[in-house]
Amino acid sequence: MDSNTITSFQDILQRMSKMQLESSSVDLNGMITQFERLKIYRDSLGESVMRMGDLHSLQNRNATWREELSQKFEEIRWLIAECRNILTKTENSFEQITFLQALQLLLEVESEIRTFSFQLI
């Protein structure tokens, strides 16, 4: 993974963890957890693609990888919708910047996961 992406994930997660949104903190904690899981999934998928010999073993070992991939895209779409929802409600510039950057990062990660998945197919 590119070091800028790692920094972006860490920066966004750190800033989100310090926020107190008007919505419940449970919602924000859920978003943070999903961001962390998405980062781990993206990293592992990218590593599998980089080790071309592992592609066939990944497909053989994990017959449900396409289902997992579909689930991750659903999670990304949910996170994008949540970020957009927060952006429409907040007037706090710190929150706006954080969630705009989170939205941009989600779109980049979605594109990268699509690229990785096409290489796996």
From Swiss-Prot:
A motif (Nuclear export signal) lies at residues 12-21, 85-94. GO terms for biological process: exit of virus from host cell nucleus through nuclear pore. GO terms for cellular component: host cell nucleus; virion component. It holds the Pfam family Flu_NS2. InterPro entries: Flu_NS2. Its main location: virion. It is found in: Virion; Host nucleus. Keywords: Host nucleus, Host-virus interaction, Transport, Virion. Gene3D superfamilies: 1.10.287.230. Interacts with protein M1. May interact with host nucleoporin RAB/HRB and exportin XPO1/CRM1. HAMAP family: INFV_NEP. Average number present in a viral particle is estimated to be 130-200 molecules. Belongs to the influenza viruses NEP family. This is Nuclear export protein.
